[in-house]
UniProtKB/Swiss-Prot annotation:
PANTHER family: ARSENICAL PUMP-DRIVING ATPASE ARSENITE-TRANSLOCATING ATPASE (PTHR10803), ATPASE GET3 (PTHR10803:SF3). Signal peptide: none annotated. It comes from Neosartorya fischeri (strain ATCC 1020 / DSM 3700 / CBS 544.65 / FGSC A1164 / JCM 1740 / NRRL 181 / WB 181) (Aspergillus fischerianus). Pfam families: ArsA_ATPase (PF02374). NCBIfam families: GET3_arsA_TRC40. Belongs to the arsA ATPase family. The keyword Transmembrane helix does not apply. One of its GO terms (cellular component) is GET complex. ATP binds at K34, G35, G36, V37, G38, K39, T40, T41, E245, N272. Its EC number is 3.6.-.-. This is ATPase get3. The gene is get3. Zn(2+) binds at C283, C286.
Length: 340
């Protein structure tokens, strides 16, 4: 964590996200924060700005609440689809907590799906997925496989509220545990299970336990490979979104420490919902709230002197629809100047 020295003049970090737009090597951008701080609005706005400077942008929501559809006023689902009014900005909504059963069920119907034929007897399913988080890890791996094959130049993740945000970093370990357990079972009971399953027609797709292990191994490799990219500051960065209140500041600090411990780059904080009452305003509530916000904003700027801290105003209307998002997104690159 940076020291809390006072920073002067030219040393101040630019209060915009321009550095992210200028960094052409970036492939993965995560936007995260506490619930209700304007995470989705920020990720949509950042994606809009990226679409101006990059060939192709994919915006993915991994938040089960799925607010992308609401933000753009357009229905998104598991498949990437173009956002209305853009030729190089697509969006999709996935649920990484979704059960692996959906993927398993697609086994027989989709011959070339990487997960095809993963179906197995209930006993094997229970054994394979008894390790906490393995279904989530495999769902996430499946999403990453799909995303990699789509070859977008940059991918923006609108993540679930903090707590779930960084779970994906533990997935390679989780899958390694599942693989170790399955390998052990396979060596002990493989021949017997294969003969039992063989007697009743085998696994869907005519596979055996070894092929199941190979599939899980390929998913683990996908996650491991992408995680290596996540830890490369040239390819990945994390944008923290917060509001100027104690709990949100505390959550942001916790998240930044966790990101640092995982070796993930973060150098930008967006502070949303700031009030700027006019000079001599008679609104007591506005002035009291501004005073409180000012205190926390000063703390943020002291704590994160080497971060780009972007100050965004509280608006009178909800930011929904293409036009309002575009207007909001401009403030990520051109600092908001409150009216005098």
């Amino acid at each position: 964590m940076s020291s809390t020295a006072v920073v002067h003049g030219d040393d101040l970090m630019e209060p915009t996200l321009q550095s992210i737009l200028s960094q052409k090597t970036l492939r993965w951008i995560f936007v995260g924060g506490k619930g209700g701080v304007g995470k989705t609005t920020t990720s949509c706005s950042l994606a809009i700005q990226l679409a101006k400077v990059r060939k192709s942008v994919l915006l993915i929501s991994t938040d089960p609440a799925h607010n992308l559809s609401d933000a753009f006023g357009q229905k998104f689902g598991k498949e990437a689809r173009l956002v209305d009014g853009y030729s190089n900005l697509s969006a999709m909504e996935i649920d990484p907590n979704g059960s692996i059963q959906d993927l398993l069920a697609s086994g027989e119907s989709q011959g070339d799906d990487p997960m095809a034929g993963l179906g197995m007897g209930n006993m094997m399913q229970d054994l394979a997925f008894s390790i906490p988080g393995v279904d989530e890890a495999m769902s996430f791996a499946e999403v990453l496989k799909q995303v990699k094959s789509l070859s977008y130049e940059v991918i923006v993740f609108d993540t679930a509220p903090t707590g779930h945000t960084l779970r994906f970093l533990q997935f390679p370990t989780v899958l390694e545990k599942a693989l170790a357990k399955l390998s052990q079972l396979s060596s002990q009971f493989g021949p017997m299970l294969n003969s039992i399953l063989g007697a009743r027609g085998g696994l869907p797709g005519g596979q055996n336990i070894d092929e199941l292990l190979q599939k899980m191994e390929s998913l683990r490799e996908t996650i491991s490979e992408v995680n290596t990219q996540f830890k490369n500051p040239d390819m990945t960065t994390f944008v923290c979104v917060c509001i100027a209140e104690f709990l949100s500041l505390y959550e942001t600090e916790r998240m930044i420490q966790e990101l640092t411990s995982y070796g993930i780059d973060t150098h930008a904080i967006v502070v949303n919902q700031l009030l700027f009452p006019k000079e001599g305003s008679g609104c007591e509530q506005c002035n009291a709230r501004r005073k409180m916000q000012k205190k926390y904003l000063e703390q943020i700027e002291e704590l994160y002197e080497d971060f780009n801290v972007v100050r965004m105003p509280l608006l009178v209307e909800e930011v929904r629809g293409k036009e309002k998002l575009e207007k909001f997104s401009e403030m990520l690159v051109h600092p908001y100047v409150p009216p005098q």
